[in-house]
């Protein structure tokens, strides 16, 4: 059994080394599309992230812990607590 495991591990390592040694370098045609450094940062489009104020109250309202989750959220922000108003928005107290 030990011999079999040693053989399998050795075989896997050999396959990895052979696959790396057979890798073909990229040709110059692919280098034209590669963007590096500061230019790459300028060309990257920013991702759109939504900040949903109602996530704490609306998503957790079905579990019955909506006000507790809102209060915990406000405590983590450094406020004295909070509550969910009628529109489902977490309102933190000062």
Swiss-Prot record:
Keywords: Antibiotic, Antimicrobial, Cleavage on pair of basic residues, Defensin, Disulfide bond, Immunity, Innate immunity, Secreted, Signal. It is found in: Secreted. One of its GO terms (cellular component) is extracellular space. Coiled coil: none annotated. GO terms for biological process: defense response to Gram-positive bacterium; humoral immune response; innate immune response. Gene3D superfamilies: Knottin, scorpion toxin-like. SMART domains: Knot1. Residues 1-23 form the signal peptide. The keyword Disulfide bond applies. InterPro entries: Defensin_insect, Defensin_invertebrate/fungal, Scorpion_toxin-like, Scorpion_toxin-like_sf. Residues 24-54 form a propeptide. Disulfide bonds join 57-84, 70-90, 74-92. Responsible for the anti Gram-positive activity of immune hemolymph of P.terraenovae. Belongs to the invertebrate defensin family. Type 1 subfamily. This is Phormicin. It comes from Protophormia terraenovae.
